[in-house]
């Protein structure tokens, strides 16, 4: 199998992340030519400067990790990130609204972020582990109609992360209209390979370097 590097969002979203760690993440991403880095909003400007001479996109999160922020706050956070040079946004839906079937509230959040993103790539986290399959499919339909670029499985901060079955379900429901990102618990090449084979177009992980090194040792897996 070819290198997974172009499919990896090299991620650092832990609470105690430092500028030095973000810089190291960016240097690793540039060296291995990952698709992007995914970092906390306050580090966007630093990452943009660090990656200015590379092809690596800079991504950040909005409404992360609980999705509690109002639509207006998510829109404003997105606009600020765009002003600082961000390329990609990973936003979290209002999960309670999704569970209650109040998809109008979910749509409002998503549309607001898409508008503020002004053409930047938008990935929408639906936190699959809390949802019934029928609701996951409904959300894929909503996101595809709204114009989101990706549906993303998880924040990595919930009770569980990406599952092969969810990737297959989302990929099938999307029907090529929207892409799928796997995130949460992808810590090794074998798991990454499973997610890509199941239909993921991106994989979010804080173990990108380890995954590439494992792939180099056993690329045939």
From Swiss-Prot:
It catalyses: 2-deoxy-D-ribose 5-phosphate = D-glyceraldehyde 3-phosphate + acetaldehyde. Its EC number is 4.1.2.4. Keywords: Cytoplasm, Lyase, Schiff base. One of its GO terms (biological process) is carbohydrate catabolic process. The active site is at residues 90, 152, 181. Gene3D superfamilies: Aldolase class I (3.20.20.70). It comes from the Bacteria. Pfam families: DeoC (PF01791). One of its GO terms (molecular function) is deoxyribose-phosphate aldolase activity. It is an enzyme of class 4 (lyase). InterPro entries: Aldolase_TIM, DeoC, DeoC/FbaB/LacD_aldolase, DeoC_typeI. NCBIfam families: deoC (TIGR00126). This is Deoxyribose-phosphate aldolase. It comes from Syntrophotalea carbinolica (strain DSM 2380 / NBRC 103641 / GraBd1).
């Amino acid at each position: 199998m070819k290198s997974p590097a172009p499919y990896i969002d090299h991620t650092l979203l832990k609470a105690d992340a430092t500028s030095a760690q973000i810089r190291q993440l960016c240097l690793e991403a540039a060296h291995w030519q990952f698709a992007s880095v995914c970092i906390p909003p306050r580090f966007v400007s630093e990452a943009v400067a660090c990656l200015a001479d590379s092809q690596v996109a800079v991504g950040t999160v909005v409404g992360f990790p609980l999705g509690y922020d109002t639509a207006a706050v998510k829109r404003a956070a997105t606009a600020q990130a765009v002003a600082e040079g961000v390329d990609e946004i990973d936003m979290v839906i209002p999960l309670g609204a999704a569970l209650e079937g109040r998809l109008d509230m979910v749509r409002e959040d998503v549309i607001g972020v898409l508008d503020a993103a002004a053409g930047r790539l938008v990935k929408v986290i639906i936190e699959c582990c809390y949802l019934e399959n029928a609701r996951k499919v409904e959300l894929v339909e909503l996101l595809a109609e709204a114009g989101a670029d990706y549906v993303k499985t998880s924040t990595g901060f919930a009770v569980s992360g990406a599952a092969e079955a969810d990737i297959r379900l989302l990929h099938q429901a999307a029907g090529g209209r929207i892409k799928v990102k796997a995130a949460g618990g992808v810590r090794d090449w074998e798991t990454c390979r499973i997610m890509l084979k199941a239909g993921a177009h991106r994989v979010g992980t804080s173990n990108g370097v380890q995954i590439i090194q494992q792939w180099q040792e056993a690329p045939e897996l």
